[in-house]
Amino acid sequence: MVAVGSTLPKVTLWENKPEEVVEFPSQGKFIIVGVPGAFTPPCSSQVPGYIANEKQFAAKGISGIYVVAVNDVFVTKAWKKSFDGGEQSGVHFVADWNGEFTKAFDAGFDASGLLGPLRSKRYAAVVENGKVVKVFIENEVTDVDISSADKVLSSL
């Protein structure tokens, strides 16, 4: 599983449209929020905290927040639009459509019974200069506690 000291895998991710490839910053501090699936109730309850606290995260030195879901880019774009203030926020909703990032980051689990074969575990990772410096992994993928925006923000 993703751990402190892990480096970010070099894989392709997308935002907004298939032609818009996302690259995580190589310098600075940012947060990756891994979620099992767009529009699922627990994920949809977790993400608004990151949108609402975007300025508070910036005040603590966070240059970006990237919500990564094993969904296609059209789904992640629609999901961002579904949140109050989502479209206007600087929070990135990133599609890991084939799960390549999730697998390489060792953050996947088999959700065949409900969401499909591969989904991301629920976590938040603080990344600085390309390395994970803090990680918040939920014990159960349906839980939203350890990786909540409030808990991550209070740790910074």
UniProtKB/Swiss-Prot annotation:
InterPro entries in the record: PRX5-like (IPR037944), Redoxin (IPR013740), Thioredoxin-like_sf (IPR036249), Thioredoxin_domain (IPR013766)
Domain of life (superkingdom): Eukaryota
Keywords: Antioxidant, Cytoplasm, Disulfide bond, Nucleus, Oxidoreductase, Peroxidase, Redox-active center
GO molecular function: peroxidase activity; unfolded protein binding
Localization per record: Cytoplasm; Nucleus
The keyword Mitochondrion appears for this protein: no
Main subcellular location: cytoplasm
Active site: 43 (cysteine sulfenic acid (-soh) intermediate)
GO cellular component: cytoplasm; cytosol; mitochondrion; nucleus; peroxisome
GO biological process, alphabetically ordered: cell redox homeostasis; cellular response to oxidative stress; hydrogen peroxide catabolic process; protein refolding
Entry-linked Gene3D superfamilies: Glutaredoxin (3.40.30.10)
Ranges in a coiled coil: none
Domain Thioredoxin: 2-156
Family named by the database record: Belongs to the peroxiredoxin family. Prx5 subfamily.
Stated role: May act as a chaperone rather than a peroxidase. Has no thioredoxin-dependent peroxidase activity. Shows weak chaperone activity.
Note: The active site is a conserved redox-active cysteine residue, the peroxidatic cysteine (C(P)), which makes the nucleophilic attack on the peroxide substrate. The peroxide oxidizes the C(P)-SH to cysteine sulfenic acid (C(P)-SOH), which then reacts with another cysteine residue, the resolving cysteine (C(R)), to form a disulfide bridge. The disulfide is subsequently reduced by an appropriate electron donor to complete the catalytic cycle. In the typical 2-Cys Prx5 family, C(R) is provided by the other dimeric subunit to form an intersubunit disulfide. Pmp20 lacks the resolving cysteine residue.
Subunit structure: Homodimer; disulfide-linked, upon oxidation.
Protein name: Peroxisomal membrane associated protein 20
Native species: Schizosaccharomyces pombe (strain 972 / ATCC 24843)
